[in-house]
Curated annotation (Swiss-Prot):
This is Ribosomal protein uS12 methylthiotransferase RimO. Binds 2 [4Fe-4S] clusters. One cluster is coordinated with 3 cysteines and an exchangeable S-adenosyl-L-methionine. Its main location: cytoplasm. It comes from Lawsonia intracellularis (strain PHE/MN1-00). [4Fe-4S] cluster 2 binds at residues 152, 156, 159. Pfam families: Radical_SAM (PF04055), TRAM_2 (PF18693), UPF0004 (PF00919). The keyword 4Fe-4S applies. Keywords: 4Fe-4S, Cytoplasm, Iron, Iron-sulfur, Metal-binding, S-adenosyl-L-methionine, Transferase. One of its GO terms (biological process) is tRNA modification.
């Protein structure tokens, strides 16, 4: 590759969760070279694919994406340099993958993430030309993810994350404040904090900082309009921490993403989450401090040993709690996890039936909740122009997280992505709202 190229054309693909997106953005910024991002691989100098392998479907998506990319460039006279990184490489190993997919030029294990940039520059035979190598934000000016730690201290019996990502590694306050300032200086309005367990941040640092210490540094930053916390492990939401969040007020938004995984204590014990086996208490604590709280959770249906009685228990729990947002996943046995070899595995048809029943319950909850906003005036962050109707925009109220929740479809004059606007809610649908904005 030409080491004197003024700008390299990069086609970047980030699979999986927002944490992967942050890794991709940090990596591309850390290369310290001028990059032009293009939508298709055909004209790229290099392609970077950051993979996921958390569950079987993520593994399959990673494999399909790599093979499709290889097929897309196969007939080109000048093929792009293909780089594949991330959890998929860490889980299956470069040696095996290199043999199975020889068309990939460079494999990068997620355990070597600190040296990804050096390995890429060496492989491309180029040198950094920038003194400042800040993260490249790819989500526009409305929001950005802030990954505050990697790895996990928990031992959930169904999860591959500790074996792939390792134990907890918190990023320092200085690193995160610097990165946040860089993000906000670009006009971004909302920071969304993510990790395998956001509440665990700082436990591995020398001074055993708690999350409150980090938030004290972030909430005062100029330009921050919203701060959202995702991936909150139930036991990390102590009454003391909730009272702290109440005291700080805006720009923190009382949106709580608390993955409970199940409601029945027997199943939670089998999941290796015995300390989280009273989700009702956690939710009651949240609502006692924040009556206006919006709750998101995720549950796994069809876990080994889940009986019809356990399923009914979970169904009634969801009906009673009325989570505003709910992710429902059918259990998948992941090789190497304790749950994969547990007795009483649930059949696929039963899993899918139970999932469908839970989704029907949640649909009714969501429809009823969203009807309450019709006729009200809300503050919205505008995310994007609608891909099919250029006079329509998509955005979010404070109670909607990017990419995982529903959205607000906005029409009106002089609207721009990245703006905070006031709009009247005109309609509600199953998971989305429709709004009309004022003239600006």
């Amino acid at each position: 590759m030409n080491s004197h190229s003024p700008s390299l054309r990069c086609h970047a693909i980030s699979l999986g969760c927002p944490k992967n997106r942050v890794d991709t953005e940090r990596l591309l910024g850390s290369l310290g070279i001028p990059l032009t991002f293009i939508d298709y691989p055909n004209n790229a100098d290099f392609v970077f694919i950051n993979t996921c392998s958390f569950i079987h479907t993520a593994v399959q998506e990673s494999v399909n994406t790599i093979l499709q990319l290889v097929a897309d460039v196969e007939e080109l006279s000048e093929k792009p340099f293909i780089i594949v990184a991330g959890c998929f490489v860490g889980r299956y190993g470069e040696k095996i993958l290199k043999k199975d997919i020889p068309e990939v030029d460079l494999w990068l294990d997620n355990k070597e993430i600190e040296s990804w940039n050096e390995q890429i520059l060496l492989a491309l035979n180029i040198k950094s030309t920038f003194l400042v190598t800040d993260r490249i934000i790819t989500t526009g000016k409305s929001y950005a993810w802030l990954k505050i730690s990697d790895g996990c201290q928990h031992s959930c019996s169904f999860c591959t994350i500790p074996s792939i990502r390792g134990s907890l590694h918190s990023y320092s306050i200085d690193e995160l404040v610097k990165e946040s300032r860089h993000i906000l200086d670009q006009g971004v309005k909302e920071l969304v904090l993510v990790a395998q367990d956001v509440t665990a941040w700082g436990r591995d640092l020398p001074n055993n900082y708690g999350l409150k210490t980090l938030l004290d540094h972030l909430l005062v930053l100029d330009g921050l309009k919203r701060l959202r916390l995702m991936y909150l492990y139930p036991t990390g939401l102590t009454k003391d921490f909730l009272l702290y969040l109440k005291s700080v007020g805006e720009p923190f938004v009382p949106y709580f993403d608390v993955p409970i995984q199940h409601a029945h204590p027997d199943i939670l014990s089998c999941m290796g989450r015995p300390f989280a086996k009273n989700p009702r208490k956690v939710i009651d604590n949240i609502r006692s401090v924040f009556p206006e709280a919006v709750l998101r959770t995720s549950v796994i249906t069809g876990f080994p040993g889940e009986t019809e009685g356990h399923h009914v228990y979970l169904s009634k729990f969801i009906e009673e709690i009325k989570f505003q947002h709910l992710g429902i996943f059918s259990y998948v046995a992941e090789a190497g996890t304790p749950a994969a070899v547990m007795p009483n595995q649930v059949g696929e048809k039963v899993k899918e039936q139970r999932k469908a029943e839970l989704m029907e319950i949640q649909l009714k909850i969501s429809e009823k909740w969203l009807k309450n906003f019709v006729g009200k005036r809300l503050s919205l962050i505008v995310d994007n122009v609608h891909p099919e109707w250029p006079e329509l925009y998509t955005g979010r109220a404070w109670f909607q997280a990017p990419e995982v929740d529903g959205m607000v479809y906005i029409s009106g004059p002089n609207i721009k992505p990245g703006e905070l606007i006031e709009a009247d809610i005109m309609e509600s649908h199953s998971y989305d709202l429709v709004a009309l904005a004022d003239s600006y």
